[in-house]
């Protein structure tokens, strides 16, 4: 699939996350370039089913290069911790969730047997 521009629902979500982030930290919003880059990366992740700069470049038919995409990720001062909090707030607000409890239950997934040299890796605590 060819990516000419980010999906409209992804762009709307990124805008909502940016607004939610600016409510808590007025000076820490995303720039237009950061919003465009983030929307492209989220759209490319949905389209390619992977997080791979080379696949993103191929999907955009060379509009974005691997070097430019990875440079933006490594050098842009994106407030990842604030974006995580803001995105969770946007998702909860959009789905009308006002209260609840978070329960993480991973007891049905046995640990991977690929790491042989780590002590107590396979010991399960119930």
List the predicted regions and their residue ranges.
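Gly/serine-rich nucleotide phosphate-binding loop at the start of the catalytic core
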Residues: 1-84
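Active-site-proximal, Lys/Arg-enriched surface segment
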Residues: 40-42, 70-126
């Amino acid at each position: 699939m060819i990516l000419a521009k980010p999906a409209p629902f992804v762009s709307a979500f990124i805008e909502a996350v940016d607004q939610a982030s600016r409510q808590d930290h007025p000076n820490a919003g995303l720039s237009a370039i950061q919003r465009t880059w983030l929307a492209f990366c989220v759209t490319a992740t949905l389209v390619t089913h992977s997080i791979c700069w080379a696949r993103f470049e191929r999907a955009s038919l060379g509009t974005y290069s691997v070097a430019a995409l990875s440079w933006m990720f490594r050098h842009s001062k994106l407030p990842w911790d604030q974006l995580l909090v803001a995105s969770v707030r946007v998702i909860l607000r959009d789905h009308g969730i006002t209260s609840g409890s978070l329960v993480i239950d991973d007891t049905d997934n046995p640990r991977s047997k690929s790491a042989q040299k780590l002590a107590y890796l396979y010991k399960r605590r119930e």
